[in-house]
């Protein structure tokens, strides 16, 4: 049994929530929270007839730590599942620490303003010197490691599809299916365009940043 607060109700979050509701014996209660509550309500109404999971909804601004704390303290989840934008990772982690709740996300933190002088200095030092060209870096979230350890809490990072599910598939294959593996190629694609003239497999802005950046090997 578990009680999970899901923050986010976009394309990725909707799929993750739908999958959770297929395993009602594990995800017994879900609260879907987003800046736009009507989107949460619509998804809850769509899923409710097909699941035993108890679904509730809430409105929250994930940029506001106090709002997040108020919601977490009111709902009292076992886990906060952050499927909002990566710009909001740190505020949600701060709220989880303040409220004593475990944390999980699907995408590593990056600042919304990549021209911010403080961030640029860290980016130049930690990312560019290491050969990275994408506008993100796990060091911001790794800085929370001791805080979560001291609080007796777990923060599970990067549990999306790639990275995330693909790593689990690779680890399973290496352990159970193959004697040895030399290389693994991972290709991202969509299952159709879903009626959109421009269909990405994640948040369009972030997707364009990623595919236009030189690869790091």
Residue ranges and their predicted role:
Residues 13-17:
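N-terminal Rossmann-fold NAD(P) dinucleotide-binding loop
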Residues 49-64:
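Rossmann-fold cofactor-recognition segment
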Residues 60-77, 84, 88:
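Conserved Rossmann-fold cofactor-binding substructure of NAD(P)-dependent oxidoreductases
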Residues 4-11:
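Conserved N-terminal Rossmann-fold NAD(P)-binding element of oxidoreductases
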Residues 107-153:
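Rossmann-fold NAD(P)-binding glycine/threonine-rich loop
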Residues 139-217:
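Rossmann-like dinucleotide-binding core of oxidoreductases
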Residues 29-31:
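Short beta-strand element of Class I
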Residues 35-39:
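Helix N-cap at the beta1-alpha1 junction of Rossmann-like dinucleotide-binding domains, i.e.
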